[in-house]
Swiss-Prot record:
One of its GO terms (cellular component) is cytoplasm. Belongs to the universal ribosomal protein uS14 family. Pfam families: Ribosomal_S14 (PF00253). Binds 16S rRNA, required for the assembly of 30S particles and may also be responsible for determining the conformation of the 16S rRNA at the A site. It comes from Histophilus somni (strain 2336). Part of the 30S ribosomal subunit. Contacts proteins S3 and S10. One of its GO terms (molecular function) is structural constituent of ribosome. HAMAP family: Ribosomal_uS14_1 (MF_00537). Keywords: Ribonucleoprotein, Ribosomal protein, RNA-binding, rRNA-binding. InterPro entries: Ribosomal_uS14 (IPR001209), Ribosomal_uS14_bac/plastid (IPR023036), Ribosomal_uS14_CS (IPR018271). This is Small ribosomal subunit protein uS14. NCBIfam families: PRK08881.1.
Amino acid sequence: MAKQSMIARDVKRAKLADKFYEKREELKKVISDVNTSDEERWAAVLKLQTLPRDSSPVRQRNRCRQTGRPHGVLRKFGLSRIKVREAAMRGEIPGLKKASW
């Protein structure tokens, strides 16, 4: 089980990313637009830098929903490989079966 503080930190980052998503996208659009002047572009870059660091979606970590494990998380299920295997062995995931060839 992951530390509760680490899980809480990721939840906080997700909330911040949602809150600043539109503003961040507007600024990135201005920066990448070829028709904007250099002054406008530079002002947008400075505004983007003043936003909270944790508001960037890149800083979020995929974590297992049950254990909070940060590594080996399967996106399709939102669970770590260990919990997916346990659930599959109990038959709790429809359509998923152990491979044999």
